[in-house]
């Protein structure tokens, strides 16, 4: 099996056309009505996957439940084994989780696009994934850009976790409320980081576009309508900052309530290269289930793209792919890799992971006394963390064949 995969990767690499042979500023994917057009003039229908959990850890992809955001996972690891070993783990995790082999494999499966979720802290000196200064966000993205260029894949940069938190749930790695919309300081940082990213990649045709904020403004809050009214103005502010340095790349705008509500948008003509992005988990796999997305796409005459979909049966996914292709909504399934199934590449759960790591993550540690009482066996806990990092390496993961087939990437 492993030889077959490596052979396929090699043949994919050798057979890939030089999609990105030129770097002139005219060589970018562009918006044309409801379609995306490649530099060669051909239509681009997005098909691919998300590199979730790599630069934006989420608890369930580690097999954790109550410890479910990046800062919670990091705190749990530091409490268990100390900050220095936590930093060692995070570096190994980042080095192993996504590599050149992963990107070539994704291409070989038939994908043309990858969505890369990331945390804004990767572009600050805030404590994040083992670093407290000189964060490595650009280094990590530069690597993926190079691998995507080699494979012939487009890349969408998705700020999954924004300053202050844009969602109000674990997925934004914040503090339970979308403070981004009430903090001028956070908004300035949000726009500044996007401008820095755009300035670095302004001449890079591998980049399809910049997705400003993942799943902003959850439905939990009594003042959600007031928050929703602030979404479009903040998007415009960020677009303005980006356009000061990058006039070319597409900018992707997600709706509120898990990227499913678009009624708060009233102006879609303020920039010539914007598109919208929706998400869908659950519900019937029918055209009627995404009628609101289709209607908004038709109203704006701009592309609509399903940035996240998945975590369902193979049959449901295959049927939804047929629907999305029929209505011209491209897609990237979530996620590419995690513990267990429902992904392209499964990570083997280390032996004793549940009884030691998961159990510790659910043990009360709200006081220093509880913290001391919960302290695990150091050698055992450290070995399990490093085994998880090793198991996440491409050569140690397992392709989920039926899942991959359900994505319709080669059809």
List PLM regions with ranges.
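Short acidic, Pro/Gly- and aromatic-enriched capping/linker segments at domain boundaries
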Residues: 22-35
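A general structural signal for short secondary-structure junctions and capping/turn motifs
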Residues: 1-3, 20, 39, 321-324
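Active-site mouth of glycoside hydrolases
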Residues: 32-46, 50-250, 255-264
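Alpha-helical transmembrane segments and their juxtamembrane interfaces
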Residues: 13-14, 168, 318
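A short, polar/charged loop/turn motif at coil->beta-strand junctions and beta-hairpin connectors
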Residues: 23-25, 40-45, 270
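Extracellular glycoside hydrolase catalytic/binding regions
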Residues: 26-29, 188-338, 343-360
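Aromatic-rich peripheral "rim/lid" segments of glycoside hydrolase catalytic domains that contact
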Residues: 316-411
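Bacterial Sec-dependent N-terminal signal peptides
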Residues: 1-23
